């Protein structure tokens, strides 16, 4: 069925009135740029390069996924998939489980999202096998744990994640690079 409609306003504020539809219907379209959080939201696949302390590494996990969701307040949540590394000094085979860092805030000056999550109580499953340091347990991210997310104009996502796990003596620095999954 067809209904008579009127359009008024500008291309940035368009109103469509349909008086005979459901007792009268108005649709108002507000043009606005997509938020930075909306632009970065999605599922990504790529690689992570990991360093333990100042000298060990880099070690590479070649098939890593990240999911980024936009929050209504303009922040984002970042969920890491499981990451597997081989040949890691003292640990040999290292698996880091999935975890989520919430409410990374946007900084327009650096065009990036970041959060110090060291006091958020987030835990990660840490499994090390085949080396001098065998572990298979959950650890809380500790002091100096900070994540920064940047989306380049070409769609490349970079996540810099510097953290400590439990009482381990060395900080870990990880750099993820990926693109939106198809």
Where are these regions (language model features)?
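Sec-type signal peptide cleavage vicinity
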Residues: 27, 56-57, 65-72, 172-176
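Predominantly extracellular/secreted and cell-surface proteins with exposed
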Residues: 1, 60-145
């Amino acid at each position: 069925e067809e209904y008579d409609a009127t359009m008024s306003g500008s291309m940035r504020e368009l109103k469509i009135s349909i008086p005979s539809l459901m007792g009268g219907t108005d649709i108002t379209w507000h043009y606005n740029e997509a938020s930075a959080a909306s632009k970065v939201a999605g599922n990504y696949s790529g690689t992570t390069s990991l360093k333990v302390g100042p000298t060990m590494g880099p070690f590479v996990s070649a098939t890593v996924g990240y999911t980024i969701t936009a929050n209504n307040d303009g922040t984002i949540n970042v969920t890491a998939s499981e990451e597997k590394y081989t040949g890691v000094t003292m640990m040999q085979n290292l698996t880091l489980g999935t975890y989520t860092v919430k409410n990374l805030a946007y900084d327009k000056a650096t065009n990036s999202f970041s959060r110090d999550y060291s006091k958020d109580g987030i835990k990660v499953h840490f499994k090390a096998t085949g080396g001098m340091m065998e572990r298979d347990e959950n650890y809380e991210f500790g002091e100096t744990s900070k994540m920064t997310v940047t989306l380049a104009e070409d769609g490349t996502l970079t996540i810099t994640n510097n953290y400590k796990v439990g009482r381990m003596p060395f900080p870990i620095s990880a750099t993820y690079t990926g693109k939106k999954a198809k």
